[in-house]
Structure formats: C-alpha cells, structure tokens
Amino acid sequence: MSEKVCVIIGASHAGVSLALQLRKEGWEGLIELIGEEKELPYHRPPLSKEHLSGDKGLDAMRLRPEKIYQDNSINLRTGRSVESIDRDGKKVTMDNGESLAYDKLALCTGAQVRKLSIGGQQDLIFYIRTANDVANLMKQLEAGKKVVVIGGGYIGLEAAAVLSKNKLDVTV
C-alpha cells in the first residue's frame, strides 16, 4: 500500500495551521502545502500597518520558521498555484504542469481582493493583500502626494492612518 498524501491548497494561516495540526494529530502520510506567494507564509494583518509603515519586515511576520516545515516533514511549495483539481482522479495540477495525487484535499485559499472596474491609470491603483502588493505601493509613495483609499474597513483605515502619518494627503 502506498503512503497517504494530503494536499493543502493555500499556504497562509489556515493551510499552515492545518498542516501542523495534522502532524500533531498523528497523520503519518505526506503533506503537500501549496502557496502562490514565493515567500514563506506570513501574518497578513501587519501588512496594512507595521509593514506598510516600514516598522516590521517580512521576516518578523513569518507564521513559522522554515525549519518547522522541515522538522514536520511538510513539503512547502511556494510560488506555485493549482490550475486544476481532478476530483474523480484525486489529483491536482499545478501551474508548472506537475500533478500531485492525493488521498485528502483541503482548500485553504482564503479571500481574494475584489478588483474594481475603475477607469484611469490602472498602474496607479493598488490593493493590499500580499507583501508584494505593499512593496509595489511603497515604491509610489512620496510625501505630499494625494492618495484615495477606497474602503473604510480595518485594512483601509489602517492604511489611511499609516499613509497620513507619512505626510501623504489621504482621502477615505
């Protein structure tokens, strides 16, 4: 009998927590943890505060050190996305064409940013969901520039506060 395989799609908080909990609960099979971002998994809440302000780097935001994945025999596949799921054949195919067979499959993909249909210069419209999003936004920030934040939830207001503190003219 071949070794059991659990494929987890989504290497953020839910996916990492599931992978570690599987080991804690005694799962002895393979664990394949697939994440789109190239970085090790990190906490997202600081993106719109400490990371945007430059007070906290990505290394300080890691969910777990890289060694934890190795120590728990979790095959962390960063920079990969799943293109298709064959439920009948019990396999997933990634963007690089590689297929992984599974016995158990968990979808831990989280939310996606809702892109707005706004005219104008699309290269000047930014969203905050990933560390890369924040890095791209930070490249455009200069004191005195005008910024419009669309969204008055936690992330929008936190980002607005940080941008305002950094001498940008912010409208929410």
Task: Please give the residue ranges for each predicted region.
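Short secondary-structure capping/turn micro-motifs that flank functional sites
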Residues: I85-D86, G156-E158
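Glycine-rich nucleophile elbow surrounding the catalytic serine of serine-hydrolase chemistry
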Residues: V16, Y154-L157
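Proline- and acidic/polar-enriched loop/turn elements at helix boundaries
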Residues: I31-I34, S81, I118, Y154
